[in-house]
Amino acid sequence: MLKVTLICSDKNHPVFRWLHKWKVENEHNYIINLLTCIADITSEGDLLFLVSCSEIVTKKHRDMFQQCLVLHASDLPKNRGWSPHVWSILNGENDITLSLLEAEDKVDMGRIWKKAKIKLNGTELYDEINQKLFEGELQLISWACKNLSCVTPTQQDSSAANY
């Protein structure tokens, strides 16, 4: 059975309860750990997902997993850095792109596994934006678990990067 670890740095972050729900719904398919800190990793696994994780995962910890993946709310390589979807919305964009990428030493620089677009109609409130965002993140997590053995990641074009 696939061994999946999810890390969200703060139990009070709104996405944490969504991750817990995903864990409960998928425990019959995978062995799942939901943690708040890299130091809490006690064993190797297949997939490590970093969702609203404020820590940079060292190579030592990344090497404990077949893949270490980050969920990032921007159309990478554009809008690297923390919480870019907030700035996209404030700038009047009507959608959020979620990028699923490999974790590296440098933040948001890894190869891209998959992207997903979330449409906004412009009337959503905070909780409604979060719901769409978190549902999209969970879909990407499920997709990665099902497609681990057949993914061909693509390199980011660093010349198009901004922060």
What residue spans do the PLM features occupy?
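One-carbon transfer enzymes
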Residues: 1-163
